[in-house]
Structures are given as C-alpha cells and as structure tokens.
Swiss-Prot record:
This is Enoyl-[acyl-carrier-protein] reductase [NADPH] FabI. Belongs to the short-chain dehydrogenases/reductases (SDR) family. FabI subfamily. One of its GO terms (molecular function) is enoyl-[acyl-carrier-protein] reductase (NADPH) activity. It comes from Staphylococcus aureus (strain NCTC 8325 / PS 47). The record marks 40-41 as: Critical for cofactor specificity. It is an enzyme of class 1 (oxidoreductase). The active site is at 147 (proton acceptor), 157 (proton acceptor). GO terms for biological process: fatty acid elongation. Transmembrane segments: none annotated. Changing residue 193 to S: Exhibits an 13-fold decrease in kcat/ Km for NADPH, whereas kcat/Km for DD-ACP decreases only by 6-fold. Inhibited by 1,4-disubstituted imidazoles, 1,4-benzodiazepine, naphthyridinone derivatives, triclosan and its diphenyl ether analgues. SUPFAM superfamilies: NAD(P)-binding Rossmann-fold domains (SSF51735). NADP(+) binds at residues 13, 19-20, 40-44, 66-67, 94, 164, 193-197.
C-alpha cells in the first residue's frame, strides 16, 4: 500500500461530506498524510470541523481563504508555511457559477456571470499554484478537478463548461511553467457525482442514468474513487506525469 506518512497536502474546496475533495481527503488520510484544509466562509469551517472527526488527523489545520481575494490567498499560504512548513502538494476542487448562468441559454450568459465563473473556477488555480510553489522548494504536485463538459458541449453545463475548458488549459500551461521547479500539475476529470455543486446542473439525474447505461463499466463512480486517483497524482508514483487530464468516469469519455 502507498505510504504518505511524511507528506503534507493542502485540500481546497470541501463543502460537505459529499464533496469530491472530501473523498480525496479520506484516501490521503488513510494513507497517513498530514492534511491542511482551506475554506471560504465561517459556516464552511464548522462543517469541516465535523468532518475532521471522521479522519485520523492529530491536529486541525484550517485556514480561511477566499480565492477571489489575492490578499487572502497570499496571506493564507504564507500562514500555512509558518504553521506546517513545506508542503508536498495541493488538491484544488473549487468552482462556482451563478445558477441563472447554468439554467438559461448559454448565449444569454452575462459578462459578470462569465467572468465570475472564470475567476473562481480557473484563475484561482493560477494564483494558488503561484503561492503554493513557495512552499514546495523541492518540487511537488498540484491536482485540479474538472469535468467532461470542459472538452465537449454538455447540455445545461453552459458557462461552467467554458470555465472547465479554461481550467484544463490552465493546467497545461502551469505544467509547462512549473516543470523546471519539479512541480507537476494535472487534472482529474470526474464523472458526475451527487455533490452540492451538481445540484445546479439541470438534468443531472438523466446524466447519471446515461452513464449507467452506456459507460463501459455500467456504473457511476464515487468520491473515494476520485480520491484514489488523486493519491496517485499527488504521490511520487506519478513522478513522470504532468499536464495530464485523467478521466475517472467509468470510461464514459471514451464512447460515443
């Protein structure tokens, strides 16, 4: 079994127990890693504190970081460095779009809504990578969560699909930029999972049913399966992998 006892990872984007990022946390925790968590609002901190009771972390390392604020990202990672020292990687699972920009016609997306989705869902990875790099002097790994809607036009995904396409390009350019620093940057394209964010996508149950019927594995995946792939990408087992987008979707991406 993979041993991550001497590794420290920052996990961003846990909203509740259904979050993909929490599935990642559970797997990394089982493998012995020290985990650091960020959250946006105070109510998220309270939820995180409850979830930590399910993990084996001896200490609660929780930091409030709103990725829309450069100052909070900069100060947050600086404080993480002071408290826990260097880190080995970051799991980024942050995305947001206004509900009306997911449910309406894509051509009616507002400028404000378009930029908001890009800012939170894509640009946040850029500034996070810049600050996390300072805590990875010997190299490390950054992994982001994406979805098939960034590669193909998916009904009702709208502005978030464009944001995910941006995120996936972001991953490639960060991989190129940070490669000389021995920092790898990859993405996991996860199958639709019943998370808080998924509630905003129209026809979500139809998508789940289609995957069960048409995907090679004839089933949907869960958060822990994404977590297992994240553990691989965050660990030295994937030392030669960067700029990659690995699909954890029962093979749905491979069929027409």
């Amino acid at each position: 079994m993979l041993n991550l006892e001497n590794k420290t990872y920052v996990i961003m984007g846990i909203a509740n127990k259904r979050s993909i990022a929490f599935g990642v946390a559970k797997v990394l925790d089982q493998l012995g890693a020290k985990l650091v968590f960020t959250y946006r609002k105070e109510r998220s901190r309270k939820e995180l504190e409850k979830l930590l009771e399910q993990l084996n972390q001896p200490e609660a390392h929780l930091y409030q970081i709103d990725v829309q604020s450069d100052e909070e990202v900069i100060n947050g990672f600086e404080q993480i460095g002071k408290d826990v020292g260097n880190i080995d990687g970051v799991y980024h699972s942050i995305a947001f779009a206004n509900m009306e920009d997911l449910r309406g016609r894509f051509s009616e997306t507002s400028r404000e809504g378009f930029l908001l989705a890009q800012d939170i869902s894509s640009y946040s990875l850029t500034i996070v990578a810049h600050e996390a790099k300072k805590l990875m002097p010997e190299g490390g790994s950054i992994v982001a969560t994406t979805y098939l809607g960034g590669e193909f036009a998916v009904q009702n995904y709208n502005v978030m699909g464009v944001a995910k396409a941006s995120l996936e390009a972001n991953v490639k350019y960060l991989a190129l930029d940070l490669g000389p620093d021995n920092i790898r940057v990859n993405a996991i394209s996860a199958s639709p999972i019943r998370t808080l964010s998924a509630k905003g996508v129209g026809g979500f149950n139809t998508i789940l049913k289609e995957i069960e019927e048409r995907a090679p594995l004839k089933r949907n995946v869960d958060q822990v399966e994404v977590g297992k792939t994240a553990a691989y990408l965050l660990s030295d087992l994937s030392s030669g992998v960067t700029g990659e987008n690995i699909h954890v979707d029962s093979g749905f991406h491979a069929i027409k």
